Amino acid sequence: MTKPPNRNTRKRTDYTRRSKPAGTSDSGWIWGRHAVLAAVENSRREIRALHVTRNAARDLPADTPHTMSEPDVIDRLLPPSAVHQGFAAEVSAIKPDPVNSVIDPTHGLVLVLDQITDPHNVGAILRSAAAFGVRAVVMQDRKAPPLFGTVCKSAVGAAERVAHVRVTNIADTILEMRKAGRFAIGLAGEGESDLAAAIAGPDNQGYGPGLVLVMGSEEKGIRPRVREACDVLARIPMTDKVESLNVSNAAAISLYEAAKWRPARGEAP
């Protein structure tokens, strides 16, 4: 009698040893087709374990080490709510870019997230940031989710494609960027300026790659000291039928408004 094949047989030996156990601060799980495939292609990620179903394995780049697993095996590796589409990977954290990379006003549009902690929102914002050509997303080191799990699933691969910077003090970082010549616009419902007008500037020429957009959490908005660090507070014009937008939607609108100025100034779209 022929013994049936073990469908969970490891295809390579590369992942049989882990430098650190799963769940440590320098590693985490991601899932979903786009998130995992983008991580596999990202040289800044170390893939410590890669589990895929037989059908999902067809989408992997040739010679990618992986473990062939049944869907229920992958289910047990992940949180109960994870929709993995046959892909799951334990990966290293992406090393943040240095803060100096976003100070220079010629380096491109910067998006600052002030204590936005919801992983779905952060993931969706990263997706919009990739779509609209953001140079880097700045987050507070202890008040932002790590780039694993739901963040990466919601970002649909964009977490691997947008640079991110972690800082201790958001307000001080904004002031440092302004000192170097950047212009910082904070988004607030009570902002004194319309967003489009704020981005256009007083001479209607825009601020080009030196623009900084600052978003706050839905519950508290931008904190007082961060508000004070901005050049101006701006609002997205809305009817009185709703009080506010989801922060990821507000970020997408804001980034679209900023992106419209790049072709006008001869910058790469």
Regions found by a protein language model. Give the residues of each.
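Structured adenosyl-cofactor binding patch, chiefly the S-adenosyl-L-methionine
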Residues: 37, 131, 153-158, 224-269
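Short acidic active-site motifs
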Residues: 98, 169-173, 194-197, 222
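Short, ordered loop/turn segments at secondary-structure junctions
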Residues: 55-56, 71-73, 142-144, 189-190, ...
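Short amphipathic alpha-helix with an adjacent loop that forms part of the alpha/beta core around
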Residues: 99-105, 176-178, 195-207
